[in-house]
Regions:
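Nucleotidyltransferase catalytic core that binds NTPs
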Residues: 1-137
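A short, N-terminal "cap"/entry segment at the start of jelly-roll beta-barrel domains
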Residues: 129-166
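Conserved active-site beta-strand-loop modules that form the wall/rim of enzyme catalytic pockets
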Residues: 22, 166-168
Length: 168
């Protein structure tokens, strides 16, 4: 998903780039992120622009991920590059087994695990959740969202106001 891109993604992509002359990144859709995480933090075009502007990324491809896999994207890559190139589907520290990976069935693709490191060093979800769960600091004090009723457009906030201060 690369939503948002973090140090673990960078390590994965740099290590994957060392395996080949070209790095093609398959970028999941906003719909996939909504199914997996509730909603995207950054939309597809924002994520694509970030990735396309990394010196080690040669191409960013969209694909049909409605089956929650990258099979369609890998099939696109095979059509673009086979038979002249060795093709790798690289997985970082959070995927390390053929048992739970539908992409293993794509002909012409070699699977690589632990690329960029054998352990997961960061998480997009963790970064986003930590950012939004911190109290917002202001000159007058701070506030925190205790409950978000997004469907109603309502947030319940706690305000802590410093003595002698008032909100703006």
């Amino acid at each position: 998903g690369f939503d948002p891109v973090h140090s673990g993604h960078i390590n994965l992509m740099l290590a994957a780039r060392e395996l080949s002359d070209e790095l093609v990144v398959l970028l999941n859709s906003d719909e996939w992120l909504s199914r997996k995480k509730g909603r995207p933090f950054m939309n597809f075009f924002e994520r694509k622009m970030v990735l396309e502007n990394m010196w080690f990324v040669d191409k960013v491809l969209d694909f049909d991920d409605s089956d929650n896999s990258a099979v369609n994207g890998l099939e696109k890559v095979v059509k673009m590059y086979k038979p002249k190139d060795d093709l790798y589907f690289c997985n970082g520290g959070d995927r390390n087994s053929l048992n739970d990976i539908p992409e293993k069935g794509v002909a012409g693709i070699q699977l690589k695990f632990g690329v960029g490191g054998d352990t997961k060093i960061n998480s997009s979800s963790k970064l986003v959740n930590e950012y939004f769960s911190r109290p917002a600091e202001r000159d007058w004090g701070n506030w925190d969202v205790l409950k978000n009723y997004e469907h109603l457009g309502v947030k319940v906030k706690e305000l802590i106001i410093k003595p002698g201060q008032s909100t703006s």
